[in-house]
């Protein structure tokens, strides 16, 4: 607290927990001892409702609870981001700083006088270009601090910043496009790597964001197929599993969602496709799950999995003669 710019005790707009600086340093050091690098993510310009509730002057409307995105036409937005990122850089020694960049609504920018002025001054054709303008400016700031910018694949929209690394979540296409353009990429396609998705029959599983990523589906990912070519494959750094916690209120629930699917994602990351063997992997997973359960952890009980059940979508009789029919797998 004290003279910190954006942290105020008893702010009525503040809710939930927080980390003290010393606690963050403790987490970073603990991870370092385990050879893990903690990469912080400060979301921008979208997913900013909580910022705009407290600092409504950074919204296009100037009001709280109206806009979802930071106002890019407002120079104060960039001052705010620089100050926040400066504190983050001080606390996290990671080479990369993740700036989010995903799911910006952008609707308010199209009618915001300040954003439209910014677009005209910078020769930007559309709101995608406006987001790209922000990403470029933030990258210049991070590079000046000796750090590199990492963002979700939406940062491709409007033109990718020169040194940006792309984390591809809406499929693999964004990561492939970035790699072909000479940028590094991390593959984390949601249909393989999202651990907040249900992993089995949702009628038997706890709440989840969506369905359906089985252990076998996660294991089947090929993040860097040889068909991409010798110039592209080296630009793909690896894979990442994501657990978003809107529907995961407890540590036990988190363990259930993570394990054993994170084992599949890890093995995808370090294994050549021709060396992968799902049957062998599955047998090892059953042993690992039993080991976890014996020690009081809460993994998904893989031995009782229902699985994809492809036989349930084989058509037997259809009354729509001569009409196209699409069959979806259960829970998808």
Which residue stretches match the model-derived regions?
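Disordered, acidic Ser/Thr/Pro-rich linker "stalks" and the adjacent N-terminal cap
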Residues: 311-332
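Short, solvent-exposed coil/turn linker segments
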Residues: 20, 71, 126, 214-215, ...
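Short, well-ordered coil/turn elements that cap or connect secondary structure elements
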Residues: 33, 144, 161, 180-182, ...
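Solvent-exposed, flexible loop/coil residues
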Residues: 48, 52-55, 59-62, 74-76, ...
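Flexible, acidic glycine-rich loops studded with aromatic residues
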Residues: 148-154, 159-164, 169-313
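Substrate-binding cleft of carbohydrate-active enzyme catalytic domains
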Residues: 1-147
